[in-house]
Swiss-Prot record:
Protein name stated in the entry: Large ribosomal subunit protein bL35
UniProt keyword list: Ribonucleoprotein, Ribosomal protein
Family as reported in the entry's similarity comment: Belongs to the bacterial ribosomal protein bL35 family.
GO biological process: translation
Upper taxonomic lineage: Bacteria, Pseudomonadati, Pseudomonadota, Betaproteobacteria, Burkholderiales
GO MF terms, alphabetically ordered: structural constituent of ribosome
Keyword Iron listed: no
Disordered: annotated segments: 1-65
Residue spans of biased composition, Basic residues class: 1-15, 26-44
Any Pfam family hit: Ribosomal_L35p
Length: 65
């Protein structure tokens, strides 16, 4: 049986953690930032955990993570 392929788009967006969860970047921080408040932009910094409802699909896209 051949190896399973990793979805490259998923590997660029998600990072696996040792406990089995994944972290992801925040959306809504690319452009049209002038109408967003400073507080809103500050809260969009950093990373978030992938929600448990999406974990199954992320694990399927990254079988070796």
């Amino acid at each position: 049986m051949p190896k399973m392929k990793t979805k490259k788009s998923a590997s660029k967006r998600f990072t696996a953690r040792p406990n089995g969860s994944f972290k992801r970047g925040q959306a809504f921080k690319r452009h049209i930032l002038t109408k967003k408040t400073t507080k809103n932009k500050r809260q969009l910094r950093g990373t978030q955990d992938v929600h448990e409802t999406n974990l199954k699909s992320v694990r399927a896209m990254m079988p070796y993570a």
